[in-house]
Amino acid sequence: MYEPSRDSEVVGLLRYVDQQLSAIRASVHGLTEQQARETPCRSALSIAGMIKHTAQGMRGVTANLRDGMAADPLTEHDFAQYLAGFVLADDESTLDVLAQFDTARADHLAAIAASDPAGENVAPPAPWQGIYDARPIHTRYYLVHQVEEMARHAGHADIIREQLDGCSVPALVMTLEGVPANPFFEP
């Protein structure tokens, strides 16, 4: 948990993102390969697919933070890659996507730490939201959006995990962090 502290803006945003990434990572703890691929809800999302998608997203964000955001429109190839990022291919395993997630996470957090929230940037087109042109932003907008996105993904992972076996992701995070039992939590 990101506990209350007096951090700089960028450190605070980084820690909120990292907290959500810990939840996403913990969501697979104790699952078999088959369970990690199951889609127990009405959507096609699985825990392993959520981890793969998050790693894909982190790689894109890291490139955007380091190299500037691409203002190019989304191509059919880009869209196909995006959709493929939600499902494990037959030749992929949960361990594969966890390794990709861990590598992407380290790079992602380093890119956030090196960013200037007040810096000038450009948000790429987002046609799914009716935005077809690049828009000027401060990097802060993009960093806060990362908190939003990672929290959404952590929430999805939590719901999927609860449907699989009743475990809540916050309890899994605390278990992995070695939090001792208390009146509100038991590992």
Q: Model-predicted segments: where are they?
A:
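Acidic/histidine-rich alpha-helical segments that form the ligand environment
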Residues: 83-125, 137-152, 156
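Short, contiguous alpha-helical
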Residues: 3, 7-10, 14-29, 33-84, ...
